[in-house]
Amino acid sequence: MNPASAPPPLPPPGQQVIHVTQDLDTDLEALFNSVMNPKPSSWRKKILPESFFKEPDSGSHSRQSSTDSSGGHPGPRLAGGAQHVRSHSSPASLQLGTGAGAAGSPAQQHAHLRQQSYDVTDELPLPPGWEMTFTATGQRYFLNHIEKITTWQDPRKAMNQPLNHMNLHPAVSSTPVPQRSMAVSQPNLVMNHQHQQQMAPSTLSQQNHPTQNPPAGLMSMPNALTTQQQQQQKLRLQRIQMERERIRMRQEELMRQEAALCRQLPMEAETLAPVQAAVNPPTMTPDMRSITNNSSDPFLNGGPYHSREQSTDSGLGLGCYSVPTTPEDFLSNVDEMDTGENAGQTPMNINPQQTRFPDFLDCLPGTNVDLGTLESEDLIPLFNDVESALNKSEPFLTWL
């Protein structure tokens, strides 16, 4: 057999071999198509181990039937396939014993959700008309043949509850919830749907029958507290009124004392004003302060102790200009310098800073002479010249 005529070997699964020796254009297009649009291949054609296509023989190695809680015994497998419900978990096996017993009955899987603990009320007899029965799963419920109701709640617990007004509200809110769940899970136990809806009010009325007196006593407590609060408020109001009366009497007494002092010392009112201004703020009210100021302050009341004197240095009547005044200290120094007996003592007694003339003399127009170097005899004719120049009536003045 000619090796050249032998067929080419088959490519491995998942691969495609294209020969480009015959038609380059067509084969090159097929190469791009095979890359851009690969053909789906079967799982059987892929290189996979044989165990991938075989189902497990037993459930000992699977997650659905773990042996960590069944004591090494594989759990039973349902006919429909793998068991997805983990009924052999550790909590279930610890509570119900073995895994086989837990999976025997589907109804017993939820038996551990509601367990009845021991209670002292179990030893007490049921009230008249009540009967206790059990369901198929062992849960007990109570029948009231008088009112035709069915409930999960033990009527003996309501009788032994302490007489507390605050504990009745949680019982009201939590009673209808287990009854509705009972109606859904065990519909054959509900004798009448209408009586079931009325069960909560009727049961509460029967439970609250022996506890009518304590709420009445509790309702009277707010009234007693309110009365006590009213008495405290009255006492507090009386104390405030008495304190206000004492303050008013003290204010009147201070006003009388002040008026008496003002009558005794009318001429010294000006000297008392600063003292009163320092004493009045911490001890007297604003009303009293206004009265005090009006009666004793000479600058505000306009009384007989003070009159407005005529001002001689305000420049009234001088037109649009004003004559600068000579300070009193300066004139007193001039008088002392003119006296003959004090002429020898003047250089020693007068302070050099006090002999310095005021600054406004330097600002006068037309005076380019240092006024600080002039003597008193030279200043007198200078002031006369300035005054005569200011008193001229010419509208236009020429300063030299």
From Swiss-Prot:
Organism classification: Eukaryota, Metazoa, Chordata, Craniata, Vertebrata
Protein name as annotated: WW domain-containing transcription regulator protein 1
Any single Gene Ontology cellular-component annotation: cytosol
Compositionally biased intervals (Polar residues): 61-70
UniProt entry tagged with the keyword Protein biosynthesis: no
Motif (PDZ-binding): 394-400
Coiled coil: 225-259
Effect seen on changing S89A: Significant resistance to inhibition by STK3/MST2 and LATS2. No effect on binding to PRRG4
Location of cross-link Glycyl lysine isopeptide (Lys-Gly) (interchain with G-Cter in ubiquitin): K46
SMART domains, per the entry: WW (SM00456)
Keywords for the protein's UniProt record, in alphabetical order: Activator, Cell junction, Cell membrane, Coiled coil, Cytoplasm, Isopeptide bond, Membrane, Nucleus, Phosphoprotein, Proto-oncogene, Tight junction, Transcription, Transcription regulation, Ubl conjugation
Ranges for region Disordered: 52-117
Modified residues (Phosphoserine): S62, S89, S105, S295, S311
Mod. after translation: Phosphorylated by LATS2 and STK3/MST2. Phosphorylation by LATS2 results in creation of 14-3-3 binding sites, retention in the cytoplasm, and functional inactivation. Phosphorylation results in the inhibition of transcriptional coactivation through YWHAZ-mediated nuclear export. Phosphorylated in the nucleus by PRP4K; phosphorylation leads to nuclear exclusion. Ubiquitinated at Lys-46; leading to proteasomal degradation. Deubiquitinated and stabilized by UCHL1 at Lys-46; leading to inhibition of osteoclastogenesis.
Organism: Homo sapiens (Human)
UniProt cross-references to SUPFAM superfamilies, sorted A to Z: WW domain (SSF51045)
GO molecular function: protein homodimerization activity; transcription coactivator activity; transcription coregulator activity; transcription corepressor activity
Domain note: The PDZ-binding motif is essential for stimulated gene transcription. It localizes the protein into both punctate nuclear foci and plasma membrane-associated complexes. Binds to transcription factors via its WW domain.
Cell location: Nucleus; Cytoplasm; Cell membrane; Cell junction, Tight junction
One GO term (biological process): regulation of metanephric nephron tubule epithelial cell differentiation
Record's function text: Transcriptional coactivator which acts as a downstream regulatory target in the Hippo signaling pathway that plays a pivotal role in organ size control and tumor suppression by restricting proliferation and promoting apoptosis. The core of this pathway is composed of a kinase cascade wherein STK3/MST2 and STK4/MST1, in complex with its regulatory protein SAV1, phosphorylates and activates LATS1/2 in complex with its regulatory protein MOB1, which in turn phosphorylates and inactivates YAP1 oncoprotein and WWTR1/TAZ. WWTR1 enhances PAX8 and NKX2-1/TTF1-dependent gene activation.
Quaternary structure, from the entry: Binds to SLC9A3R2 via the PDZ motif at the plasma membrane. Binds to YWHAZ in vivo and in vitro through the phosphoserine-binding motif RSHSSP. Interacts (via coiled-coil domain) with SMAD2 (via MH1 domain), SMAD3 and SMAD4. Interacts with MED15. Interacts with PAX8 and NKX2-1. Interacts with TEAD1, TEAD2, TEAD3 and TEAD4. Interacts (via WW domain) with PALS1. Interacts with LATS1. Interacts with YAP1 (when phosphorylated at 'Ser-127'). Interacts (via WW domain) with PRRG4 (via cytoplasmic domain).
Source taxon at top rank: Eukaryota
InterPro entries linked to this entry: WW_dom, WW_dom_sf, YAP1
